[in-house]
From Swiss-Prot:
Belongs to the heat shock protein 70 family. Gene3D superfamilies: 1.20.1270.10, 3.30.420.40, Actin, Chain A, domain 4, Substrate Binding Domain Of DNAk, Chain A, domain 1. It holds the Pfam family HSP70. The keyword Acyltransferase does not apply. Signal peptide: none annotated. This is Chaperone protein DnaK. The gene is dnaK. Keywords: ATP-binding, Chaperone, Nucleotide-binding, Phosphoprotein, Stress response. Residues 601-634 are annotated as: Disordered. Residues 623-634 have a biased composition (Acidic residues). It comes from Acidithiobacillus ferrooxidans (strain ATCC 23270 / DSM 14882 / CIP 104768 / NCIMB 8455) (Ferrobacillus ferrooxidans (strain ATCC 23270)). GO terms for molecular function: ATP binding; ATP-dependent protein folding chaperone; unfolded protein binding. The lineage of its organism: Bacteria, Pseudomonadati, Pseudomonadota, Acidithiobacillia, Acidithiobacillales.
C-alpha cells in the first residue's frame, strides 16, 4: 500500500513524517536534520537550492534567497500585511498580472506556490530516500486561520511539487492528533497554542474516547496569519540597527548583506535567550566608512528582548479569548495546554500562556515536530492504515454572499464542523430581473466591502417576474480540506450555475500545469547535475588512483605507462565538459589501461622473483659448508 506522508509546510522550517506500523517516524533530511529551513535560493548558474544549502549562502546572496514565502501565499500584493513585509525582506516582491504577491529572482518571476513547491519537493525526496519508493500522496498542514485562497494556494503548491494532496488540515488540529496518540485514556479538552515562524493559531479541541476510537472535535479556532517568530526577529533586528546607528552614525538598513547578517544574528540571539539571561551579538566587519571597517558588538539581555516583543505576545492573547468564548468554555475546563511552533519556546510566551489558562503548558510535545506527526497520522487514516481516529475540523471564518445594500449574509458561520453543506433561498431586487450576481465573501464583518472577496459568478436567464418572486437557491458546500464550492439555482427554471472557489488570488489551471512542467524540468535538471557531479567525482578518483599506480610501478613497460598517462589526460579533458557519457567512457578507457599496466607490472615482478630465486639456490664452487657451535655469552 502506498504511503501517504505528512508534511508541515512551515514559514521558517518544514518537517516530514510517515506512519510505520503503529508509530510515526519523523524523517531526517539529507543533512541528517529532522527539520528543513523553508528557504529557497537560485544560484548564478540557475541551480535551485533548498533548505540548509540555501540558508548557508543567504549572507552572500540575499536578494536571490527567498524565505518566509508562506506569508505571501494566497495573498494580494496590495494587502496591507504584504506591503508591511516588503520593508523587511531583501528579495524582490512584485505584483503579478492577477494581483497576487509574487517574487522575482534573477529576472524570473515565481509565484509563492512555486517557491513553496520547491520546499515540498525537498520533503517528498526526503521521504522517498527513506522509504525507498516513490511518494505521490500527502497530507499538508496550514495555519487554522488560513482563508480559502491560502488553502487553495497551498494545495496548488502540492500539485506543482508532484503530490496529490489528499487533505489539507489545520496545524493545531494536527498537533492535537500527535498529542492524542500518547495521551492517557478518557475525555479531555485541550488548547493548542501555535506560535510559529510567521503565523499564530489557537484551537480548542475536544478529544473523546468512543468505543476504542479517538474522536477529535475542534470546538473553535482563531488566530493571526501575520504574527510569528519573524516579527519577533524584526524587533531585535531594528533594535540592533538603531543601536549601531546611534553608536557609529551608520544606518545598516540600506546594506542588504549587512541586514542578512543582522537577521541571522538576531534569530540566534533570540534562541540563546530562551536558556540564558544574556548573550553577545558580535558581527565583525559589518560595514565600513572612510575611517575603516566597523564592527558590531553589543550585549542583549532577556529582559530587553521581552520588552521589545511584549506587545506581540499580548497580541496572541486576544485570539485566545475569542476562541474560548466561541467554544463556550471557561479556562478552568481546559485539561491540557499544548505549545506548538518554535517561538512558543520563549519563556515569556510560556509565562503568558500559563497566566491565561491558569496551568503550566505541557512540555512533552515537540513543538517543531508535532504538526508533521499529526499530518502523518491523518495520512494513515486516509490510506486505511489507521482506523481508530476520527477527526472533525472546522471552518475558521464565516462564509456568505453580498445581498441588497452591500450587506454580507452569512450561510456558514465560523467554527462550523466540516465537511458541511448549507442552502438558503434568495430572490431578485428588481422587477423582471433576468440575472443575479453571486458575490461570495469570507469574514466576520457586517458589510460586504469589509470582508474578503472570494469569487463572483452570474446566474442568468431568470424568468421575468416581479421582484421578490423568483426563488434563487444558493448552496455552499465545504469539503474536508476547507475548500468551498458554491452553486446558485433558479428553482422555477431549474437553471443552475456553480463554481469551485479557486479564489480570486489563485492560479489558473493553465498556470498550475505550466508550473508543474517547470518543476519536473527542474527535477530533471537536478538529476542531470547530480549525475555530472558523480561522474566528475569518479573521474577525479580514477585519475588519482592511476597516477599513484604509475608512480608505484615505475618498472612497468613504457608503452603501458604511456597508455595510462594518455588516458588520464582524456579523463581530465572530458571532466571539464558536461557530457556525462563522455566522462564515463574516458574513465572506462582509463580503467582498462590501468588493468593492463597492473597485469604487466605483476608479470614482470613474478618473473624477477623467479629469476632471483633460481640464482639464490645455486652454490658457487669456492663456498665451503662450515660447522659452528654456539659459545655461551659471559
Amino acid at each position: 500500500m502506498a504511503k501517504v506522508i505528512g508534511i508541515d509546510l512551515g514559514t521558517t522550517n518544514s518537517c516530514v513524517a510517515v506512519m510505520e506500523g503503529d508509530k510515526v517516524k519523523v524523517i531526517e533530511n539529507s543533512e541528517g536534520k529532522r527539520t528543513t529551513p523553508s528557504i529557497v535560493a537560485i544560484t548564478e548558474e540557475g541551480e535551485v537550492l533548498v533548505g540548509e544549502a540555501a540558508k548557508r549562502q543567504a549572507v552572500t546572496n540575499p536578494e536571490n534567497t527567498v524565505y518566509e514565502v508562506k506569508r505571501l501565499i494566497g495573498r494580494k500584493f496590495d494587502d496591507a500585511e504584504v506591503q508591511k513585509d516588503l520593508k523587511h525582506v531583501p528579495y524582490k516582491v512584485i505584483k503579478a498580472d492577477n494581483g497576487d504577491a509574487w517574487v522575482e529572482v534573477r529576472d524570473k518571476k515565481y509565484s509563492a506556490q512555486q517557491i513553496s513547491a520547491f520546499i515540498l519537493q525537498k520533503m517528498k525526496k526526503t521521504a522517498e530516500d527513506y522509504l525507498g519508493e516513490k511518494v505521490t500522496e500527502a497530507v499538508i498542514t496550514v495555519p487554522a486561520y488560513f482563508n480559502d485562497a491560502q488553502r487553495q494556494a497551498t494545495k496548488d503548491a502540492g500539485r506543482i511539487a508532484g503530490l496529490e494532496v489528499k487533505r489539507i488540515i489545520n496545524e493545531p488540529t494536527a498537533a492535537a492528533l500527535a498529542f492524542g496518540e500518547d495521551k492517557k485514556p478518557g475525555d479531555s479538552k485541550i488548547a493548542v497554542y501555535d506560535l510559529g515562524g510567521g503565523t499564530f493559531d489557537i484551537s480548542i479541541i475536544e478529544i473523546a474516547e468512543m468505543e476504542g476510537e479517538h474522536q477529535f472535535e475542534v470546538l473553535s479556532t482563531n488566530g493571526d496569519t501575520f504574527l510569528g517568530g519573524g516579527d519577533f526577529d524584526s524587533r531585535v533586528i531594528n533594535y540592533l540597527a538603531d543601536s549601531f546607528k546611534a553608536e557609529s552614525g551608520i544606518d545598516l538598513r540600506g546594506d542588504r548583506l549587512a541586514m542578512q547578517r543582522l537577521k541571522e544574528a538576531a534569530e540566534k540571539a533570540k534562541i540563546e535567550l530562551s536558556s540564558a539571561q544574556q548573550t553577545d551579538v558580535n558581527l565583525p566587519f559589518i560595514t565600513a566608512d572612510q575611517s575603516g571597517p566597523k564592527h558590531l558588538n553589543m550585549k542583549l539581555t532577556r529582559a530587553k528582548l521581552e520588552s521589545l516583543v511584549e506587545d506581540l505576545i499580548d497580541r496572541s492573547m486576544a485570539p485566545c479569548r475569542v476562541a474560548m468564548k466561541d467554544a463556550n468554555l471557561a479556562t478552568s475546563r481546559i485539561t491540557d495546554v499544548i505549545l506548538v511552533g518554535g517561538q512558543s519556546r520563549m519563556p515569556k510566551v510560556q509565562e503568558k500562556v500559563k497566566d491565561f489558562f491558569g496551568q503550566d503548558p505541557r512540555k512533552d510535545v515537540n513543538p517543531d515536530e508535532a504538526v508533521a506527526i499529526g499530518a502523518a497520522i491523518q495520512g494513515a487514516v486516509l490510506s486505511g492504515e489507521k482506523k481508530d481516529v476520527l477527526l472533525m475540523d472546522v471552518t475558521p471564518l464565516s462564509l456568505g454572499i453580498e445581498t441588497l445594500g452591500g450587506v454580507m449574509t452569512k450561510l456558514i458561520e465560523k467554527n462550523t464542523t466540516i465537511p458541511t453543506r448549507k442552502s438558503q433561498i434568495f430572490s431578485t431586487a428588481e422587477d423582471n430581473q433576468s440575472a443575479v450576481t453571486v458575490h461570495v465573501l469570507q469574514g466576520e464583518r457586517e458589510l460586504a466591502r469589509d470582508n474578503k472577496s472570494l469569487a463572483r459568478f452570474d446566474l442568468t436567464d431568470i424568468a421575468n417576474a416581479p421582484r421578490g418572486m423568483p426563488q434563487i437557491e444558493v448552496t455552499f458546500d465545504i469539503d474536508a480540506n476547507g475548500i468551498l464550492h458554491v452553486s446558485a439555482k433558479d428553482n422555477q427554471t431549474g437553471k443552475e450555475q456553480s463554481i469551485k472557489i479557486t479564489a480570486s488570488s489563485g492560479l489558473s489551471e493553465e498556470e498550475i500545469k505550466r508550473m508543474i512542467q517547470e518543476a519536473e524540468a527542474h527535477a530533471a535538471d537536478d538529476k542531470k547535475a547530480r549525475a555530472l557531479i558523480e561522474a566528475r567525482n569518479e573521474a577525479d578518483a580514477s585519475v588519482h588512483g592511476a597516477r599513484k599506480a604509475v608512480e608505484e610501478h615505475a618498472a612497468a613497460p613504457e608503452h603501458d605507462k604511456t597508455k595510462v598517462t594518455e588516458a588520464i589526460s582524456a579523463v581530465e579533458n572530458a571532466a571539464k565538459g558536461e557530457d556525462v557519457e563522455a566522462i564515463k567512457g574516458a574513465v572506462a578507457t582509463l580503467m582498462a589501461a590501468m588493468s593492463a599496466l597492473l597485469q604487466s607490472a605483476a608479470a614482470g615482478q613474478a618473473q624477477a622473483e623467479s629469476g632471483a630465486g633460481a640464482q639464490g639456490n645455486a652454490k658457487p664452487d669456492d663456498v665451503v659448508d662450515a660447522e659452528f657451535e654456539e659459545v655461551d655469552k659471559k
